[in-house]
Structure formats: structure tokens, C-alpha cells
């Protein structure tokens, strides 16, 4: 039941996020789009902040299952959305169930493979992507046409998203909780509070995306954001055993980087996409994010379990430092791809 509820909840989140971006890019002036895309990532960071602060209290004094009820508040917003979102002309459309199925098979199998390094999921993932490629070439009414991926800028942006976003929860969900508990010998509750300033900074930076966009081009903003992400990972890798304040500062830089990157990266991805195809483009963009994040959690957790020691040393600190160096190399690869 919990898994089913989580599937429904995640589906709603993915749809809401994608539809918001589609609304912004279709109905708002181009000069305002970065501002409102920034509000989206700011809201996400703020939600993470509130989740960290309230989940412990709810789990302790009520029940962790009560957290599922929080999302019911969103039902109250439906009348407002119905009244304020402009109506659009509806057309008959074919839902490519088979194409979506192949994508789901590929994505889930790839995540399982990265988490376990078992050959069967790898084979299933390869079969899934092969069948998807065959499907879009062999049939007409598919979720996307092959020509869609001939747009070099869009494909490059998707690669950057896949690579860089895989590091997003590697730091906050794997390294920081583990380092706080096993390196600094403090509680997981402490780890949650150390993450709070990072999400707060991310929310502020996201809300200021419009102002940042007026002073920096999309390219410069993206490179600055990627630089912040890389610096955060390298800083933590070098000083992880020194003080927990290092983790706080790193998380602030890290969250600021992702918040700054979101709006200009979306804008770059769809810059050359025809207006009638932006919905599909944004859908695949968010699909890539939703694939990259669990992939990152899977390989980061696997590295932690393997007790990896890249630069010598022993103990838990050396393991988490090595994980961070791997994440830093991956983030650097994302910068190279973008360049």
C-alpha cells in the first residue's frame, strides 16, 4: 500500500511540475519566463526545507504515515487553478502507451542495475531502450518522432541534466547523513538540521532567478551554477572530517547551484524547439531529471556499501571523501559536456 501510494504521489508531482513549466513557456512573455521558472525551483527547495523541519515532528508525535495526508492540502487549490488557468483548444491525441511502457522498463531496469550491478536488469534495460528506438521508427503516432532528437542543443542539454542531476541527492541524502552519523558521531536529526540552511539558500536563489537572468546570460548563469556545485563537492571531499560547518557551507553552495541552474537550463533546452512541441520537450527534460536523481542515489549508496577508498586512507571518512570525489568528477564531466 505504501509503495502504491508513493507511486501515485510521485506521478502527481511529475505531472504538476511538467505542466507548470509548459504553462510558463506557453503563456508568459519570454522576458518573464526565467523568473517564474525560478519560482518553481524555489518552491521545490522550500518544500524540501519544510519537509525536513516537519517530518521528524510528525513521525515522532503523530505517525510517519500522516505525512501522506499533507499532500491533500493541494486539493483546495483545484478551484483556483480551474478559474485562473486559461482554457486551451483541445485536440484528439493518441496516447502512446507502448512507448511509455518501453521507457518505464528502461528507466526502472537501469536504476536496479546501478544499485545491484546484476546483469539481468542491464539486459532488460538494453532491450527496453532498443525496443523504444524501434518503436518510434516503425510507428507513426508515437510519443516522440526520431527527428525530435536531431536538435543538438536539446540533446546536449539532456546529457548535462542526466549527468549533473545524478549528483543532486548524492550529497544531501547519502554523504551528509552518513558523515554526520559515522564520522562526526552525531544523530541523524542533527544531519537534517545541517541541511536546512542549504534548502533555505536554494529557495532564495531560485526566487531571484529573474534578477540573475537580467545580469547574466543563460550560458554564464549555468556555468556559474555548475561551478558552485563542483566547488561544494570538492570542498566537502577535502574537509569532510574537519567540522560539520563544512557540510553546512557545502550544502548552501550546492543548493544555490542547482537553484540557479534550473531556469536558464530549461530555457536553453527549449530555445530551438517549435512551440507546438515544447510540451514533449519539457516532458522528456523532466523525465531525465527523474531518472538521473534515483540513479545518483543508487550509485552513491553502492559506493558507500563498497567502502571505496580512492586516494588512500582508511575508515569511514575516506569512504565518504572518495564518494564525493566521484561525484565531483561526474559534475566536472557535466561541465565539459555543456562547454
Model regions: which residues?
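Helix-loop-helix hairpins in multi-pass membrane proteins, especially solute transporters
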Residues: 1-92
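Interfacial loop-to-helix junctions that mark the boundaries of transmembrane helices
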Residues: 2-4, 8, 63-65, 113-124, ...
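Hydrophobic core positions of alpha-helical segments in small-molecule transporters
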Residues: 4-5, 17, 39, 43, ...
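12-transmembrane solute porter fold
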Residues: 12, 24, 143-309, 316-339
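Cytoplasmic-side transmembrane-helix entry/capping segments in multi-pass membrane proteins
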Residues: 33-43, 91-101, 147-153, 219-226
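Hydrophobic transmembrane-helix bundles of small-molecule transporters
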Residues: 60-160
